[in-house]
Amino acid sequence: MPPKSRGTGPKKTQKARRRDKKNVPHGAAHIKSTFNNTIVSITDPAGNVISWASSGHVGFKGSRKSTPFAAQLAAENAARKAQEHGVKKVDVFVKGPGSGRETAIRSLQAAGLEVGTISDVTPQPHNGCRPPKRRRV
């Protein structure tokens, strides 16, 4: 078995992928708000992601990711990127118990997207997994 070469061969350069601008006037905004983070994804009607942002992606770390302000900035960032692809109207699907739910919806409206329907798609267990123990503060 020949010894492995340590980067002495020719370098393979990867061609940068070109993002083509889609023209999607109507989409869906999926807001997943957990106790630790908020993730906003804007998709086309088929479910393909057009743009996304999260509290951590916007620049917050640790416990600041779970704040409503971080969710607001994440939603504005995702909305701005989606508007570059022609999105004007969205239906909002909210999932999770986090603190950034309402703030993210409001900031989508403030960013210039017209919000059609708002639906809560939080999964409810039919006595599935055992929940985490109660906090004693």
UniProtKB/Swiss-Prot annotation:
Keyword RNA-binding belongs to the record: yes
Basic residues bias: start-end ranges: 12-21
Gene3D superfamilies: Ribosomal protein S11
Superkingdom field: Bacteria
Pfam families: Ribosomal_S11
Gene Ontology CC terms, in alphabetical order: ribonucleoprotein complex; ribosome
InterPro entries: Ribosomal_uS11 (IPR001971), Ribosomal_uS11_bac-type (IPR019981), Ribosomal_uS11_CS (IPR018102), Ribosomal_uS11_sf (IPR036967)
Record-level GO BP terms: translation
The keyword Ribosomal protein is assigned to this record: yes
Disulfide bridge partners, by residue number: none
Region (Disordered): 1-31, 117-137
Keywords (A to Z) from UniProt: Ribonucleoprotein, Ribosomal protein, RNA-binding, rRNA-binding
Leader sequence segment: none
UniProt-recorded Gene Ontology molecular function terms: rRNA binding; structural constituent of ribosome
Protein family: Belongs to the universal ribosomal protein uS11 family.
Protein purpose: Located on the platform of the 30S subunit, it bridges several disparate RNA helices of the 16S rRNA. Forms part of the Shine-Dalgarno cleft in the 70S ribosome.
PANTHER family named in the record: 40S RIBOSOMAL PROTEIN S14/30S RIBOSOMAL PROTEIN S11 (PTHR11759)
Subunit description: Part of the 30S ribosomal subunit. Interacts with proteins S7 and S18. Binds to IF-3.
Protein name: Small ribosomal subunit protein uS11
Lineage: Bacteria, Bacillati, Actinomycetota, Actinomycetes, Mycobacteriales
Record gene name: rpsK
